[in-house]
UniProtKB/Swiss-Prot annotation:
<dbReference type="InterPro" id="IPR001238">
    <property type="entry name" value="DNA-binding_RecF"/>
</dbReference>
<dbReference type="InterPro" id="IPR042174">
    <property type="entry name" value="RecF_2"/>
</dbReference>
<dbReference type="InterPro" id="IPR018078">
    <property type="entry name" value="DNA-binding_RecF_CS"/>
</dbReference>
<keyword id="KW-0547">Nucleotide-binding</keyword>
<dbReference type="InterPro" id="IPR027417">
    <property type="entry name" value="P-loop_NTPase"/>
</dbReference>
<protein>
    <recommendedName>
        <fullName>DNA replication and repair protein RecF</fullName>
    </recommendedName>
</protein>
<dbReference type="GO" id="GO:0006302">
    <property type="term" value="P:double-strand break repair"/>
</dbReference>
<keyword id="KW-0235">DNA replication</keyword>
<keyword id="KW-0067">ATP-binding</keyword>
<keyword id="KW-0742">SOS response</keyword>
<dbReference type="GO" id="GO:0009432">
    <property type="term" value="P:SOS response"/>
</dbReference>
<keyword id="KW-0963">Cytoplasm</keyword>
<dbReference type="GO" id="GO:0005737">
    <property type="term" value="C:cytoplasm"/>
</dbReference>
<comment type="similarity">
    <text>Belongs to the RecF family.</text>
</comment>
<dbReference type="GO" id="GO:0005524">
    <property type="term" value="F:ATP binding"/>
</dbReference>
<dbReference type="GO" id="GO:0000731">
    <property type="term" value="P:DNA synthesis involved in DNA repair"/>
</dbReference>
<dbReference type="Pfam" id="PF02463">
    <property type="entry name" value="SMC_N"/>
</dbReference>
Length: 360
C-alpha cells in the first residue's frame, strides 16, 4: 500500500496541505517548529484515525478555527481508495471507501508503522508501554485479539469492582462468575501474545543483529508463570493463580494476576536493555521492533505499510542508516523528517511556517 496524496485543512499549523509523495523515500525537511512533525501527524491521523501526540482531537484544529480535515488517497493491491477524517465541534467523523469506520478498523486495514522519539519508552518506560505495543501494534495480526481485549478489560473492571465491595453469598457468586470471564479472555490474550511473538521476535532479533552486530533476545514475562510459549496456556492456569491470591486481592481491591500485569524484556547481549543498554543500543532495539512490524504487515497482508520516521534515523551513523534504508527499499513507502540533511534518491519536501513545497 502507498499514499498517493495527502490533503489537510486547518490541521495544526497547516491551513492548507496538498502533497503527492513518492512511492519510495520521502524526506520532509525544515527547521524546528516549522511543521515537520505536524506533517507526519497528519499522515498518521488519516491512516489511524487518532493522533500520536495528543489525547484531545480539539488540539489538532488550527487555533481560531472550528473544524479541520485530513484526507488520504491510497493505492494498493485491491485498487485505489480514500479515507477522510473530519473534526468539528460535534466530534470526529472518519469515512473510508465511502463508509463510516472507527479507528480500530483503520488500524487493522491500513498499515502504518510509526517511529518517534517517544517510542524509546518501549525500552525506558514501564510495563504498560510494552503491553500497549503488544496489544495495539502486534495484536492486530491475531484474529479475534482486539475483541478479546475489549471483553477482558470489561471483565477485569467488573471483577475489580467486586473485589472492592467484599462480603456476602451473592458477592461470592458474582466474583466467581467474573473470575471465569477474566480467565477465559485473559488466556485468549496470553495465547495470542505468545503466538505472535513466536513470529515477531525472530524478525526483530535478526534485524538488530544485522545492524548492530550484537545479540537481541525477547522474553515474555507472565504473571501466570508461563513464558516464551513453553506450552499452550489454558484458562485453568490463570484460575489457579487467582485462587492462590484471592485474599490478597480482596485486601488490595485489585486483580493481581493476568495479562494486564505481564511484561516484555529485551535482552541485549544477555543483559536486560532497560537498565543496561546504552542510548544507541536502545534506539537500535526500538527501530528493529518497528521494522519487524513492516515485515509482519507484508507477510500477513501481502502489502507493505506506510513507514513514518520522525527525525530519529539521522541519529544513527551513516553505515547503520544505509542498512536501515536498504532494508526498507523493497516496495515500502517511507517518510523521514530531518533538519537539513537530504538523502539521494528521495523526493524532498521543505516545510516552513506551515507551508510545504516539493523541492526540484
Amino acid at each position: 500500500m502507498r499514499l498517493t496524496r495527502i490533503k489537510a485543512g486547518n490541521f495544526r499549523n497547516f491551513q492548507h496541505l496538498d502533497v503527492q509523495p513518492a512511492a519510495g523515500l520521502n524526506i520532509v525537511r525544515g527547521r524546528n517548529a516549522q511543521g515537520k512533525t505536524n506533517f507526519i501527524e497528519a499522515v498518521f491521523f488519516a491512516l489511524r484515525g487518532h493522533s500520536f501526540r495528543s489525547l484531545r482531537d480539539r488540539e489538532l484544529v488550527t487555533w481560531g478555527q472550528e473544524s479541520a480535515f485530513v484526507e488520504a488517497e491510497l493505492e494498493g493491491k485491491d485498487g485505489r481508495t480514500r479515507v477522510r477524517a473530519e473534526l468539528n465541534p460535534a466530534g470526529k467523523k472518519i469515512v473510508w471507501a465511502g463508509e463510516p469506520v472507527g479507528k480500530a478498523e483503520l488500524a487493522v486495514r491500513l498499515g502504518t508503522v510509526l517511529f518517534t522519539p517517544d517510542d524509546l519508552s518501549l525500552i525506558k518506560g514501564g510495563p504498560r508501554e510494552r503491553r500497549r505495543f503488544l496489544d495495539l501494534e502486534l495484536g492486530i495480526f491475531v484474529p479475534g485479539y482486539l475483541t478479546a481485549l475489549q471483553l477482558y478489560r470489561r471483565a477485569l473492571e467488573q471483577r475489580n469492582h467486586l473485589l472492592r465491595m467484599g462480603g456476602g453469598r451473592r458477592y461470592s457468586e458474582l466474583l466467581d462468575l467474573w473470575t471465569d470471564e477474566v480467565c477465559k479472555y485473559g488466556m485468549m490474550l496470553l495465547s495470542g501474545r505468545l503466538e505472535i511473538l513466536k513470529e515477531f521476535a525472530p524478525l526483530a532479533c535478526r534485524l538488530f543483529g544485522a545492524w548492530a552486530g550484537e545479540e537481541l533476545a525477547v522474553r515474555y514475562r507472565s504473571s501466570v508463570g508461563l513464558s516464551n510459549g513453553v506450552r499452550t496456556p489454558g484458562a485453568g492456569d490463570l484460575r489457579e493463580t487467582l485462587a492462590a491470591v484471592r485474599q490478597d486481592e480482596i485486601r488490595a481491591g485489585q486483580t493481581q494476576a493476568g495479562p494486564h500485569l505481564d511484561d516484555l524484556a529485551f535482552m541485549v547481549n544477555g543483559k536486560e536493555g532497560r537498565p543496561f543498554a546504552s542510548q544507541g543500543q536502545q534506539r537500535s532495539v526500538v527501530l528493529a521492533l518497528k521494522l519487524a512490524q513492516v515485515f509482519l504487515w507484508k507477510r500477513h497482508t501481502g502489502e507493505a505499510p506506510v513507514v513514518l520516521l520522525d527525525d530519529l534515523l539521522f541519529e544513527f551513523d551513516r553505515e547503520r542508516r544505509d542498512k536501515v534504508l536498504e532494508t526498507l527499499q523493497n516496495d515500502v513507502q517511507v517518510f523521514i523528517t530531518t533538519g537539513e540533511r537530504v538523502l539521494s534518491g528521495s523526493r524532498v519536501f521543505c516545510v516552513h511556517s506551515g507551508n510545504i513545497q516539493e523541492e526540484s
